């Protein structure tokens, strides 16, 4: 949903410690370099220390987001509980329930940097993963990629053609990251 305006302790969120130096990329920008991601991670008041340990860490989040950005980006990822998720969805979308991910896209800066906040509601993400028979790690990866695409102007709610384009991108990006098709 788009609104305009340390070390891993959980093996499901394990990652390769390499920095990817020397890797070829299909996502190089016009200057012949990979897009850069400036990433901050925040936790809402409802997210306690125990839950933080089970969430994907900053490095893993960056690894998931990097193939989903097509120009330099500055993202804040915020993990929230049901109360904050519901309040944000109500305030900005006039819907009185918490949703899985909200993207607050602030547009592109004059220097071409895409700026956005991605807000993930942990209880909703966890419930959906269980109900859909997905691993939690795969569902978080999917929703982060989904939110990043929204931040760059993709919108599945504009029509079937736009939805198909966005889903195809998500499937391709997630496959490159080693995740299954989230729509099966």
UniProtKB/Swiss-Prot annotation:
**Alphabetical UniProt keywords:** Cytoplasm, Endonuclease, Hydrolase, Metal-binding, Nuclease, Ribosome biogenesis, rRNA processing, Zinc
Function per UniProt: Single strand-specific metallo-endoribonuclease involved in late-stage 70S ribosome quality control and in maturation of the 3' terminus of the 16S rRNA.
Q: Where is the composition biased (Acidic residues)?
A: 1-11, 19-29
The lineage is:
Bacteria, Pseudomonadati, Pseudomonadota, Betaproteobacteria, Burkholderiales
Q: Answer yes or no on keyword Cell membrane.
A: no
Free-text comment on the cofactor: Binds 1 zinc ion.
The biological process GO terms on file are: rRNA processing
Q: EC no.?
A: 3.1.-.-
Primary location? cytoplasm
Give any Gene Ontology cellular component: cytoplasm
Binding residue positions for Zn(2+): 146, 150, 156
Give the family per the record.
Belongs to the endoribonuclease YbeY family.
Species annotation:
Burkholderia pseudomallei (strain K96243)
Q: Where in the cell is it found?
A: Cytoplasm
Q: What is this protein called?
A: Endoribonuclease YbeY
Which cofactors?
A: Zn(2+)
Which residue stretches belong to region Disordered?
1-38
Q: What gene, per UniProt, encodes this protein?
A: ybeY
Q: Which GO terms describe its molecular function?
A: metalloendopeptidase activity; RNA endonuclease activity; zinc ion binding
């Amino acid at each position: 949903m788009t609104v305009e305006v340390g070390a891993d302790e959980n093996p499901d969120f394990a990652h390769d410690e390499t920095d990817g130096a020397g890797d070829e990329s299909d996502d190089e920008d016009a200057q012949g370099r990979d897009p850069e991601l400036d990433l901050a991670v925040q936790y809402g008041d409802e997210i306690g220390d125990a839950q933080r340990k089970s969430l994907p860490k900053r490095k893993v989040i960056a690894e998931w987001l990097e193939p989903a950005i097509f120009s330099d980006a500055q993202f804040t990822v915020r993990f929230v509980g049901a109360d904050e998720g519901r309040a944000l969805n109500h305030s900005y979308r006039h819907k009185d329930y918490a949703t899985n991910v909200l993207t607050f896209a602030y547009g592109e800066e004059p220097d071409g940097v895409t700026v956005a906040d991605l807000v993930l509601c942990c209880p909703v993400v966890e419930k959906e993963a269980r109900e859909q028979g997905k691993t939690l790690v795969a569902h978080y990866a999917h929703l982060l990629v989904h939110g990043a695409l929204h931040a760059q102007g993709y919108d599945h709610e504009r029509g079937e053609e736009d939805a198909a384009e966005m889903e195809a991108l998500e499937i391709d990006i997630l496959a490159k990251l080693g995740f299954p098709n989230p729509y099966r």
